[in-house]
Amino acid sequence: MAFSQAALSALPLSDRTFRKKPSSSSSSSPNFVLRVRAAAKEVHFNRDGSVTKKLQAGADMVAKLLGVTLGPKGRNVVLQNKYGPPRIVNDGETVLKEIELEDPLENVGVKLVRQAGAKTNDLAGDGSTTSIILAHGLITEGIKVISAGTNPIQVARGIEKTTKALVLELKSMSREIEDHELAHVAAVSAGNDYEVGNMISNAFQQVGRTGVVTIEKGKYLVNNLEIVEGMQFNRGYLSPYFVTDRRKREAEFHDCKLLLVDKKITNPKDMFKILDSAVKEEFPVLIVAEDIEQDALAPVIRNKLKGNLKVAAIKAPAFGERKSHCLDDLAIFTGATVIRDEMGLSLEKAGKEVLGTAKRVLVTKDSTLIVTNGFTQKAVDERVSQIKNLIENTEENFQKKILNERVARLSGGIAIIQVGALTQVELKDKQLKVEDALNATKSAIEEGIVVGGGCALLRLATKVDRIKETLDNTEQKIGAEIFKKALSYPIRLIAKNADTNGNIVIEKVLSNKNTMYGYNAAKNQYEDLMLAGIIDPTKVVRCCLEHASSVAQTFLTSDCVVVEIKEIKPRPIINPPLPTSSPATSSMFPDRKLPRFPQIMPRTRSHFPRK
């Protein structure tokens, strides 16, 4: 039976079947059937509460897994690595990325709660575990009241209004961080590692609070702090023939000129005029270009090896638009002019007036350092002011990071923390700790600090009763009460990981009217946490409140879930095995005997007649 085009198009896509006509070469073979199925979805309604239970199971799994890492006595999590050794981490954000459940509904619950930790980590750089625990508390307490018949929309509005009020209360509790407290913030975030805390504190004292502090893989077994003066970027020499010190494998020049070209150099004759001036006046030249072809680079290397020319060449830092910005910054820093076709400047006609000046240039295999004597300081200050205005008007965190790095390079202050370890597994764990500590310190500089150890959230819980009086109805007040209970979840879990009863800890902390008084889980004692250095960045706590609240509202007001149906891959049809036959019979004609051919023997000397 043949289908017409109209009849075929009327069929649903998931039911269409196409039958391939037999070809002349395969007339005896059966018809090949091709079934085309659309990607179907499965809809789950929460009529009996089963959907909510599945979603909550996913949220419980995330909170339970990340909860073991919370606090100074939190445990590690071992993550399987498909292509290498397992990773041992104590970082909530890293663990969060690895969670993927088989059940589609539970996995939706995982992904919903994951947003709280991921967003907090993106904005504040730390606090992902606390966000997850707080969101889990809101969801757990919220499901209890909604199951009893409370309107989830009004409960969500109560949570939202309470969040805004608590953020205002948090800001009133916050204060600006002092220089000696930077080490405490970093150490607490790194799991009470004061070696890391002191190193980060020293880094910010060296380059200033607005300076750039970066993390790199170290060459030694211990951590090391390196302060770079001048402008440095990750671009090394284009050829090892440019080195001036063979033992150190680096090229170093003093009173050096810089040629900046925002394009690819393909013809060596284009550089003749400038390089001829360098030979006659005997000054070294650093060529910074988008790229240099080998044909153009070869004559430069030959003249360098003959001793006629002191020169080195590197690629311009970054790519695309960022490359152009970096070249402009370098031009202002050294007093050079960038050669661009759009500006009407030709490399072939350019003279030494376009060259910049550096007091010292150091080029290694992977990096370049440029130091000036400060003769362009006024132009540099104006450029820094322009970039800072861009930072204020930029909302994207990645762009802010790039702009801050440009400010630091122009200001001449970069601190590099080199992380060392015995093994690769230990190195990755230490890098994550240092990164969390650095991000927490930056957040503390930005918005101030509050008392740590989960006590700031617990103190906020005492403000909820006053906030409830401003809410519209009883159901919104229930939402505020849910928040009040959830605010005790983090400190309860910190105490549990320290083998202490959380209820007793909460009772003792709240019995003291001093807002700085709290539980120090590292020492298992109660004291003034601010004096003890147990402090949290205000920005981290604020992001935890806002993002946990947002996820909980979405979770509690969801009543239907749409998931993809897991496609079952069909097994390939295997032809039935042919009947076994003896070597002397044919598989197609088992009764017919095949002729036996004489065995061909290898030819030896005995087969040849003697002469």
From Swiss-Prot:
It is found in: Plastid, Chloroplast stroma. It comes from the Eukaryota. Residues 574-595 are annotated as: Disordered. This is Chaperonin 60 subunit beta 4, chloroplastic. One of its GO terms (biological process) is protein folding. Belongs to the chaperonin (HSP60) family. Induction: Up-regulated by light. CPN60B1, CPN60B2 or CPN60B3 cannot complement the function of CPN60B4. Residues 377-480 form a coiled coil. It comes from Arabidopsis thaliana (Mouse-ear cress). Involved specifically in the folding of NDHH, a subunit of the chloroplast NADH dehydrogenase-like complex (NDH). Part of the Cpn60 complex composed of 7 alpha and 7 beta subunits. Can also form a complex composed of 14 beta subunits only. Both complexes show ATPase activity. The Cpn60 complex interacts with the Cpn10 complex. Interacts with NDHH.
